[in-house]
Amino acid sequence: MRVIDLTQTITENMPVYPGTEGPKLEPASTYEKDGLRETLLTMYSHTGTHMDAPAHIYDGRPTLDAMEADSFAGKGLIIDCREFGEGEEIPLCKIHAAGDLAEEADFLLFLTGWSRLWGKPEYFGNYPVLSQEACQFLIDTGKKGVGLDVISLDPIADAQLTRHHQVLAHDMVIVENLTGLEEAYEASRGGLFTLAVLPMKYENADGAPVRAAAIMEE
């Protein structure tokens, strides 16, 4: 078995969504003073590689803590979208090119290659986004969730969060700021693998950091 980490490390200087504060990692206990080390973490619920709950957008829809654990694991498939440039939409035909695998997967992950810009101002630029027709495919095929190696399912300029509204209305989850999709795509040979994206469980969770992993059977 091979496990590939798809998670960005949380640091104080990491990229965060425009308008939010970065995380704070402060020593709460030290070896010298307390005989152990403990850290006080202060951060927004949508920090780093994280998951959006339906309740992120819709009042009364499920929070992450209310969802069954099997909502966060299943068959994953990576769609290679690296040919799409800045501001381009990823069309439905790109998903159709994966054939039956796209139907069978519980989660579709979209590899744009944008994670190479993590830590640079360009990361917040005009990244490729899914077309609304592609988002509708996720709904029509009953996906558990969608994941991307960019900061949002929507363009940053879309203050209405059109795609978030479209997808989260159907109680899917969205995983943003993934990394390592290139390695996972090569390891999976473009096929299905086991995906685990387990969010922190706290009360009324509208979103949470996750530890995302692609698990390959060798």
Question: Residue ranges of each PLM-predicted region?
Answer:
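Active-/binding-site microenvironments in catalytic and ligand-binding cores
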Residues: M1-E218
